[in-house]
């Protein structure tokens, strides 16, 4: 049971980190594009 739950928890943490990095990247790109258009 523990051998199956540990990889699942790791994949969930990996997916969460990828999701957070993706949102951060989108936010940074949105700020850069907004600055480019306003300037």
UniProtKB/Swiss-Prot annotation:
Subunit structure: PSII is composed of 1 copy each of membrane proteins PsbA, PsbB, PsbC, PsbD, PsbE, PsbF, PsbH, PsbI, PsbJ, PsbK, PsbL, PsbM, PsbT, PsbX, PsbY, PsbZ, Psb30/Ycf12, at least 3 peripheral proteins of the oxygen-evolving complex and a large number of cofactors. It forms dimeric complexes.
Organism whose genome encodes this protein: Cuscuta pentagona (Five-angled dodder)
Topological relation to the membrane, as annotated: Single-pass membrane protein
Domain of life: Eukaryota
Protein name in UniProt: Photosystem II reaction center protein L
Keywords from the UniProt entry: Membrane, Photosynthesis, Photosystem II, Plastid, Reaction center, Transmembrane, Transmembrane helix
Location within or outside the cell: Plastid membrane
Transmembrane segments: 18-38
């Amino acid at each position: 049971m523990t051998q199956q739950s540990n990889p699942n928890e790791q994949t969930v943490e990996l997916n969460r980190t990828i999701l957070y990095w993706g949102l951060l990247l989108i936010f940074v790109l949105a700020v850069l594009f907004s600055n480019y258009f306003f300037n």
